[in-house]
Every structure is written in structure tokens, then in C-alpha cells.
Amino acid sequence: RKPYLVHARVPLLGHHTSGVRKEFYRDETDLEKHHAHDPFRKLHRKLIEAGITESELEVIRQEAEWRIEQDFDRAVQAAEPDANTVSSHVFASTPIEQEQGDRTPKSGTKVVMVDAALFAIRELMNKHPEAMVYGQDVGKRLGGVFREAATLGDQFGDHRVFNTAIQEAYIVGSTAGMAAVGIRPIVEVQFADYIYPGFNQLVTELSKSCYLSMGKFPIPMILRVPIGAYGGGGPYHSGSIESTLLSIKGIKVVYPSNAADMKGLMKASYYDPNPVVMLEHKGLYWSKVPGTEEAKCIEPASDYILPLGKANIVLEADGNYLADGDTVLIITYGMGVYWAKEAAMEFPGQVEVIDLRTLCPIDLDLLTARIRLHGKCLILTEEAETHSFAQSLAGKLSMDCFVQLDAPIQVMGALDLPAVPMNMALEKAMLPNAEKVAARIDRLLND
């Protein structure tokens, strides 16, 4: 049937809170005026007009009252929960724990990141009829402003790939209902800067559902978010939001930096029974930014899956420098991977670079092991540095690796500005880059 829109004015008939009773600020005339429009009274009248008798309605009322009393008594008499279970059910268990499939098939060809994501979703939709894609401009006519959903609408039809209104709260919040009826939604917010209207749904619904239901109602969904500064996008199309996302417990956050990781993480995110936010740097989509050519990769086979929570060493230091204690470890993600690798070229063999790939869950085992090996560490982010995820991670790792550190763990991020400027010179001044990273490496190695 067609959907119905109900536009109703509903009066407040009860107390606002137990401490602010209705009689404090409303007189009898006002209360009676609104009680005349009480939906329960109206429903009662409608049922009588429809032929239901008062005695039948009384039986229904008594049955409802009895059921409520039974449920209340059962809740009161229930045993107190075991305090040791307080951290249970933050996430539902994922079936993907090991890397699977062929990452670099011999017959494969190189693809850009945006296509790797597209191909992953196409394979998922071919295999799983419950997969559905929707968001702003992702339908067949445009296929996404970055062509990240191109051809999906033509291939799978408007009932599985469709546009939504410019309403991020709906895009995010609707996934809870979709998941409840067995659909696996893959949705998109067009730019990271526009995600904030959807945060209420991420916080109050998606992140809490598994925990509050004791694991009965996790919400499997993927929220794709193009992110990062690229080509003078300005204050409303260049933002980074990972620290804000990571303050929400109960969601997972991934941030691939190359096409192979993008495809593998997209597959793992789909099979994960929890909400997953996939941050996709616009500057890496097509490898058009100088120095990002390695974001193009051989397209992994259709069976390739990369589990969440596994960081990757993308550049290793030379063993001789390592033995002399003359190396530095850079921990980064997204565009930071390419800034770090370019900067490392000025210090051959002295720099190791780790790509986090997943920000939550995070691969603390690898990070602590490598920091203890190197003794010096720089955490690199595109976000404004102060109060960032990177600073929080630095604090955690400093405590865990304090004895083995040769210097305080350093953090490098963007300037603490409220927005990314549109002017390219100002954008460059605000953000990290390879030159700035190289200067920081030099200080770590030589001061």
C-alpha cells in the first residue's frame, strides 16, 4: 500500500517531569480544554460509534491493566544484574576475523578507490538481495556526486537503489527500521560536513541498540561518508569528523587509504552485524592529488575480505638504523599515509609508517609492539590537532609504552581553526603536508 502522512497536533496531557507537575503552570480550564482532544477519549468514542460495546472495551482495558501489572511485578522481582556484565553487548560478534580471499589476483587490473568501493557494493548486491543503497543523489540518474554509486541504479532498479531527501537524520535513522526487517542498508551522507543532523540518530538509536537489548537487536548498516580537504572545497565540503564519531561508543569507524583496503573493508563492514561508518577521503578517490598514485591498486578478487581492526605497516625501516635506535614510527591514516611516505623519502630507511585502516576497533597490539621497537613516534592526522582522536591515542600509547620511549609521542594535525579555508594558499597553510611532516621527523631524529 502507499505510505500515509499523518499531521497531528497532540496536546501534552501529563506532567512534563515528576518535578514539574502540570498543575504548577496550567489551570483547570486549560487542562480540560486539552483533555477534550485526548486521543484516548477520541478513540473510545470512535469505537463506540463503530459498534463496540462499553463492556467489551472494559474487558480490553482490564486485560491491558493485568498485563502491565504482571510485567511490572516481574521486573521488580527480577534479580539484580551481574556487575561483571556491564561491558557486555557493546558490539555483536562479527564473523569476519581473518583476512580472506585473493588481494592481488594475477589477472587483476589497477582500479581507483572510488571504483573499488563501487565494485565491492555491486558484488554484495548481486550476492545478497537484502542489500539496499540509498542517500542523496545515488540513484540511477546521477549515481552519486563522486560517481560512487554509478550504474547501481540501472543494474538493480529503483527499489534497491534510490535517492532520498536532503535529510541526514532520516538517512541515518531509517537504517534502524530497515535492519529490523532484514534489510542490509548501505547509505550515504554526501559530505562529512553534513553528517551532524544525523548524529542524533547515530547516538540515540544505532549506537545503543545492541547494548540496551543485551545483544538482541544490533543494527547492521554501512554509512559511507566522503571526507577530507580536497581542491579548495572550503568550509562546508572539507571537514574531518573522526574524533566526533569516535566519541560515540557502539559504532565502528573505518578509514581506508587505498583501493584494495577499500574493497576488503567494505565487504567486512557489510558482514559485520554492527553499525559501521566508512570514511572515504575525496582526495584519494581518483588518485589525482600528487603523491597519491599508490592509492590505485590491483582490484582484489570478489572473495577478498579485510577484517576491521587490523593496521598495516606500509613502509618499514631498515634494520641497521633500527638497531642503532635511529628510526621513527609514524602512525596515520587516510591522506596522512601519503604525506608520511613522501616525507620519509628524505630519510631513507629511518622511517616506518603504519596505516591504521580502522579507527574503531584499533589495532593496539601492533601499535604498541612497533612503538616499543622504535622508541620514537609521531601520530599524524588531517584533523585539527587539539582534543583530537590522535591526541587521545598518543596519551594511551604513551602510558602503555612509557618505559620504552626515547621521546614523548608527538602529534601533528591541522591548525586549530573552525573551518577549512576555500583559498588554496590558506588551505595549504592549515593542513599538514609532506614538507611539514619531514620537518617534524628531522626534529625527532636529531634533537
Regions found by a protein language model. Name each.
Residues 84, 260-263, 365, 435:
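Residues in well-ordered alpha-helical elements
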Residues 61, 80, 142:
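Conserved phosphate/pyrophosphate-binding and hydrolysis machinery centered on Walker-type P-loop NTPases
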Residues 66-67, 78-83, 87-89:
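The feature marks non-catalytic terminal segments
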Residues 1-2, 52, 80, 129, ...:
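Residue-level recognition of short, well-ordered coil/turn positions
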Residues 49, 74-81, 92, 123, ...:
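A structural signal for alpha-helix termini and helix-coil/disorder junctions
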Residues 1-77, 87-286, 297, 428, ...:
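Thiamine diphosphate
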Residues 9-14, 81, 89, 96:
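Core structural elements
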